[in-house]
Amino acid sequence: MKQVDIFTDGSCLGNPGPGGWAAVLRYAGTQKELGGGFSGTTNNRMEILAVIEGLEALQEPCTVNLYTDSQYVRNAVEKKWLDSWQRNGWKTAARKPVKNKDLWLRLLPLLARHTVKFHWVRGHSGHPENELCDTIARGHASRGGLPPDTQAAG
């Protein structure tokens, strides 16, 4: 399998508010930058979406080192929160509906397709790729005319 590095970040100007996501993919000396945004969204939704979009951009199953500053996303996968949520009918330990279920459902088959290792990086600490992703995500969040995130409430 090909080895790919993916760096991701999400940004929200207000929470909820206009938000942006970014993913930078690196493979064999090439780099691809992706980004987008929505109005009326949250930072956590943009963080998850950045991971989804990065993984969806891969044309075949890959071994992925995924770098994120989102403990929420990383913990949901590595601490098996996703597994627990599924077993519990998409309810948290407190029996409340899991937020962002629509995005988690999009992420699950991507995690099954690729071999993904999550790496946490401290945000806003000078990590070059994280800073690049932050710039791209903020740029998208700052644009006018963003489509609404119609699933943001769920």
Curated annotation (Swiss-Prot):
Its cofactor is Mg(2+). Pfam families: RNase_H. CDD domains: RNase_HI_prokaryote_like. It catalyses: Endonucleolytic cleavage to 5'-phosphomonoester. InterPro entries: RNase_H, RNaseH-like_sf, RNaseH_domain, RNaseH_sf, RNaseHI. Coiled coil: none annotated. Residues 1-142 form the RNase H type-1 domain. Mg(2+) 2 binds at residues 9, 134. Its EC number is 3.1.26.4. Monomer. Belongs to the RNase H family. This is Ribonuclease H. It comes from Oleidesulfovibrio alaskensis (strain ATCC BAA-1058 / DSM 17464 / G20) (Desulfovibrio alaskensis). The gene is rnhA.
